[in-house]
Amino acid sequence: MAPSTPLLTVRGSEGLYMVNGPPHFTESTVLPRESGRNCKVYTFSKDGTLFAWSNGEKVNIINVANKGLLHSFDLPKAVCLEFSPNNTVLATWQPYTTSKDGTAGTPNLQLYDMKTGACLKSFIQKKMQNWCPSWSDDEIICARNVNNEVHFFENNNFNTIANKLHLQKVNDFNLSPGTQPYKVAVYVPGSKGAPSFVRLYQYPNFAGPQAALANKSFFKADKVTMLWNKKATAVLVIASTEVDKTGASYYGEQTLHYIATNGESAVVQLPKNGPIYDVVWNSSSTEFCAVYGFMPAKATVFNLKCDPVFDFGTGPRNAAFYSPHGHILVLAGFGNLRGQMEVWDVKNYKLISKPVASDSTYFAWCPDGEHILTATCAPRLRVNNGYKIWHYTGSLLHKYDVPSNGELWQVSWQPFLDGIFPAKTIKYQAVPSEVPSEEPKVATAYRPPALRNKPVTNSKLHEEEPPQNMKPHPGSDKPLSKTALKNQRKHEAKKAAKQEARSDAAPTPVPQSAPRNTVTQSASGDPEVDKKIKNLKKKLKAIEQLKEQAAAGKQLEKNQLEKIQKETALLQELEDLELGV
């Protein structure tokens, strides 16, 4: 029988230990405290029944229910651990090393049988990135990326490769959640003028030009993040470039793409320019939330047609977290932001609370869907380390501060399978707490002596937008429907066009002091130059259409790709002509 709340595991300079969840927060006897700084890594199994950790000498595995030691492996350098979904296999990874004479190193990725303790297979895995094999939820298939192709194993038989997915230089892949039919998303970066692409396949149908379930191509991508929804019906792809050629952002440029297993794909249109900070699926698999745009960032919920469902307006935020049941959404600003959180009821789109977890670097929902963990961990921040447990209504239930000379490296909840904790009715009143709530200190702006005796003017650097259903609509208490909003915009556009036509028909007289060589936007005065400008604009429009076709997945001809490569030169030529250079 599951405990009332999951355990908390804490790893830091004080050692490795477990804490009972709310309401007690006492140290648990499940794991005797491992003192010292030698613990490098720990992990729970997916259902929370097994716990493994490395203490710098051995990797130990215990049964959480009876506290019994199951296995102990002599792996002093292990820094990564992960259980397979059904607790059949433990994967361990150690840094890859070669001998001094230059001979190849020994295999550093081990797969252990949890029943017998025997090593099923060892592989050489040089990179820590994507080190762990990916299993389907029923463990029927398991996949690894080996030398730019994906190898598939069946029924945990790692001595025989059951299938291979070979494309030109597969950079990354993502196995779908759930059981049969199994699907896999693969990413191939672009090269030699060809676009990057993400393709979806159904295992084991990889052969032939029509084998892919869906395909999405894009030019602006140095790396991608692929996110399956829970029902494995669609993937969200965040495509990122390392450098933003427009100079708008230091952190490169991001675009968000939607790809469904039925072949549909789309570019998700984000109303505000700027970085994409976070994208998360709701557990219902019918909608997703994106946090994006230059600060203050916007947050919007989209449906499967990529249409916006609800706009949360703007605010100091860079992360989004749905509760395990999908009925609550937390929008937060962590890292270099102050730690403000907004807790929303996403069924009614109603704000529940706005707690502040200052200096937080970590956030996690408790599997019960009621409690929240925030923490300040090293090495991200080496001062004021500690963790806090909140109720989603905004009450701070527990707080632990690490001593000033100590550090907190990791803290997390014990996981549980879906359905163990039923969804409860949402409360809006803050639950009682014995921990006093911390009022964040508001930093006052510097005021020069001459202004100190005068009233403070309330001015903001940015005007924050309210959520969509809070925007005032004249003559109506309810927000306008999508159709009504569209008609209103059309009417406003017509009105603006009429006013523009009138102003063109009756231009205002130019003052005598105005310079005579002012160039109008429509003409340069030289018919030959105007003709060149018109032709250049025509070519640029054709290039834009080709780019849209490529983004939609169409295979372009060689001469069409060459046209796209000429875009920069054409833009420069157009700019020179318009400036009269």
From Swiss-Prot:
Range of residues in the leader sequence: none
Modified residues (N-acetylmethionine): 1
Phosphoserine modifications at: 503, 513, 522
First and last residues of every WD repeat: 23-63, 125-163, 356-401
Chain intervals with Basic and acidic residues compositional bias: 494-503
Keyword vocabulary terms for this entry: Acetylation, Coiled coil, Initiation factor, Phosphoprotein, Protein biosynthesis, Repeat, Translation regulation, WD repeat
Swiss-Prot/TrEMBL GO biological process terms: endoplasmic reticulum unfolded protein response; negative regulation of translation; positive regulation of ERAD pathway; positive regulation of signal transduction; regulation of translation; response to amino acid starvation; ribosome assembly; SREBP signaling pathway
GO CC list: cytoplasm; eukaryotic translation initiation factor 2 complex
Residue positions, PTM Phosphothreonine: 5
Keyword Repressor appears in the UniProt entry: no
MF annotations from Gene Ontology: ribosome binding; translation initiation factor activity; tRNA binding
Start-end of Polar residues biased regions: 514-524
Chain positions covered by the region annotation Disordered: 432-533
Coiled coil: 527-578
Pfam family, one: eIF2A
Modified sites of kind N-acetylalanine: 2
Biological role stated in the UniProt entry: Functions in the early steps of protein synthesis of a small number of specific mRNAs. Acts by directing the binding of methionyl-tRNAi to 40S ribosomal subunits. In contrast to the eIF-2 complex, it binds methionyl-tRNAi to 40S subunits in a codon-dependent manner, whereas the eIF-2 complex binds methionyl-tRNAi to 40S subunits in a GTP-dependent manner.
UniProt similarity note: Belongs to the WD repeat EIF2A family.
Protein known as: Eukaryotic translation initiation factor 2A
